[in-house]
Every structure is written in structure tokens, then in C-alpha cells.
Amino acid sequence: IVWSRDQRRKMDLENPKMRNSEISKQLGYQWKMLTEADKWPFFQEAQKLQAMHRE
């Protein structure tokens, strides 16, 4: 969610006429193409946000 939130904003600005469903498909594809090492910082950020939310 952390990654897609930022990427969705960028994609929406770059492609204002693109439908939300198409943006979601593109984001899903891009996420799958990332390596585990590329994904790791976003997993860490999500864990940090979860911990803050629990407090």
C-alpha cells in the first residue's frame, strides 16, 4: 500500500485520462517486476506505520 499510494499519484498525474482500473493493473504489474530487495523498504515502512497505528 505504501508503494502503490505514491505510484498511483504519479501515474494519475502523468496519465490523467487513464481509468482507475487500468492504473491498478499497471501498478500490479510494476510491483510484480520489483525484486524483493526493491520491495523491502516499503515492507519496512508499512510495519512502521502499523506499529504507530497500534499505539
UniProtKB/Swiss-Prot annotation:
Residues 1-55 bind DNA. It is found in: Nucleus speckle; Cytoplasm; Nucleus. GO terms for cellular component: cytoplasm; nuclear speck; nucleus. The keyword Transcription regulation applies. Keywords: Activator, Calmodulin-binding, Cytoplasm, Differentiation, DNA-binding, Nucleus, Sexual differentiation, Transcription, Transcription regulation. GO terms for molecular function: calmodulin binding; DNA-binding transcription activator activity, RNA polymerase II-specific; RNA polymerase II cis-regulatory region sequence-specific DNA binding. InterPro entries: HMG_box_dom, HMG_box_dom_sf, SRY-related_HMG-box_TF-like. It comes from the Eukaryota. It holds the Pfam family HMG_box. The keyword Transmembrane does not apply. GO terms for biological process: cell differentiation; sex differentiation. Transcriptional regulator that controls a genetic switch in male development. It is necessary and sufficient for initiating male sex determination by directing the development of supporting cell precursors (pre-Sertoli cells) as Sertoli rather than granulosa cells. Involved in different aspects of gene regulation including promoter activation or repression. Binds to the DNA consensus sequence 5'-[AT]AACAA[AT]-3'. SRY HMG box recognizes DNA by partial intercalation in the minor groove and promotes DNA bending. Also involved in pre-mRNA splicing. Interacts with CALM, EP300, HDAC3, KPNB1, ZNF208 isoform KRAB-O, PARP1, SLC9A3R2 and WT1. The interaction with EP300 modulates its DNA-binding activity. The interaction with KPNB1 is sensitive to dissociation by Ran in the GTP-bound form. Interaction with PARP1 impaired its DNA-binding activity. Belongs to the SRY family. This is Sex-determining region Y protein.
